[in-house]
Regions:
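A residue-level marker of the well-folded mature domains of exported/periplasmic proteins
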Residues: 2-5, 9, 14, 23-301
Length: 301
């Protein structure tokens, strides 16, 4: 096995060498699109709402989003809820609606719970987009998807199959139980697993939630090892979770291995195909590209 990192360039996400379109686009030149975006962004205020503070994954995209909008003459306010919950995001949205923003771009903590507040924003004339984790289609005008749900799930299932040697117990360490993107990936993983005999010797023993908090993710990793003595692989489709699990497994010399979605900068010391490293390989797309594409999409609404 070798380390594999997934990369996306603006309008596509690459999964195991396959380019998957994530947003329809016309054939205009980059210069034309930039000029159009610049005209529409001039003097506009845009709010970017994250799932929670302290997530380096989102911060990379947020920085790219902000730089792109500001380069086109707009202003960005990046806002984080107090906790990674829908209720906390609703409080943030309630405050933003009263501040005369032209647009809101959000990574949602729940598929349906934000609908009333986001519909209120749109009724007030605020443009609403989303990226990374989508609210339902009635809650926004467009969603910029970093990669296809099935493609992400397929890559993760194949990694579990590979790292486990094709059989044995594995578990999933996710973000929050309401997280739209993680839940979609996990559901797709289960569907893929049930529909193909090559996964028949794998057993998904548990799905646990670290709420994208390092300590809780560490505690959940420890609990998995305690509860499942024969656990061979943990799959963490969350950058916070995978980093916490990688450190715990490696520090404790666990034979259980890890894969999932992680940031190279956070996973470098834990990644290697040998007994000394907890994670043989992991995946991720280009968060800077995702932030830039989301910015241009939002200011074009």
């Amino acid at each position: 096995m070798k380390k594999k990192v997934i990369s996306a360039i603006l309008c596509g996400a690459m999964v195991l060498g396959t380019v998957c379109p994530v947003l329809a686009a016309d054939d205009k030149s980059e210069d034309t699109k930039t000029e159009a975006a610049g005209n529409s962004a001039e003097g506009k205020k845009i709010a970017l709402v994250g799932k929670a503070a302290g997530n380096a994954f989102f911060e990379i995209a947020a920085k790219s989003f902000q730089e792109t909008v500001e380069a086109e003459g707009g202003e960005v306010q990046v806002v984080y809820p107090e906790t990674a919950t829908a209720d906390a995001q609703i409080k943030v949205l309630d405050n933003l609606i009263s501040q005369d923003f032209d647009a809101i771009c959000i990574s949602a903590n729940d598929v349906n719970a934000l609908q009333a507040k986001l519909e209120e924003a749109m009724d007030e004339g605020i443009k609403v987009s989303s990226f990374d984790s989508a609210p339902n289609k009635d809650s926004r005008e467009i969603f910029v998807n970093q990669a296809g749900t099935k493609e992400v799930a397929q890559a993760l299932m194949d990694a579990v199959l590979d790292i486990s040697g094709g059989e044995g117990q594995f578990a999933i360490l996710s973000a929050t139980s309401q997280s739209a993107n993680q839940n979609a990936w996990i559901d797709a993983m289960k569907t893929i697993m049930e529909g193909d005999d090559k996964y028949s010797k794998l057993e998904l023993v548990d799905v646990v939630y670290g709420d994208d908090e390092p300590q809780k993710s560490t505690d959940q990793t420890a609990a998995l090892l305690q509860n499942y003595k024969d656990l061979k692989v943990i799959c963490a489709p969350t950058t916070v979770g995978i980093a916490a699990a990688a450190k715990y497994l490696q520090d404790n010399g666990s034979e259980c291995k890890l894969t999932g979605l992680g940031l190279p900068s956070e996973m470098q010391e834990y990644t290697g195909d040998d007994a000394d490293h907890s994670c043989p390989y992991f995946y991720l797309w280009d968060m800077q590209g995702l932030g830039k594409l989301s910015a241009y999409t939002t200011i074009s609404l």
